[in-house]
């Protein structure tokens, strides 16, 4: 938190709600919410660059569950038909709806702590298994979900499909 400003500015998104309870209104640095231009100086390591990214191309698919599952299945099927190795990041609630590719449930949606804890391990696992393409479900951005989505967005290089 930078204390010399009139309004506090959070550069670590996972603590926004906790900070608001303590200090009142807190802004979120734009680098947390999306890609920043090359001329912007990052305020903290990892705010500007793609990091903790898998070797595979990662696409984040956001929207209503039905549309997300349908889109991921279609995209994964296309890549599998080309002979590519495909990974899918899903949740406990949707894992039975993906018949194709390497599948990793990151946890239950209601357990954001578990999802956050499993994220990097799942990405590294896909690297170890040789995935060339990874498709991930998006997550709600409330509470810890904002940090999860920030990490996924950066890992995907902001390659996001909204369906």
Q: PLM ranges: what are they?
A:
Residues 40-157:
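A C-terminal functional module that forms or caps the active site or interfaces directly
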Residues 160-163:
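Short, flexible loop segments at boundaries between secondary-structure elements
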Residues 1-11:
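Single conserved hydrophobic/aromatic residue that forms the stacking wall/gate
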Residues 21-38:
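Accessory alpha-helical/coil subdomains and C-terminal extensions
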Residues 13-23:
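Glycine-rich phosphate-binding loop plus the immediately following alpha-helix
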Residues 8, 19-20, 72:
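A short secondary-structure junction signal
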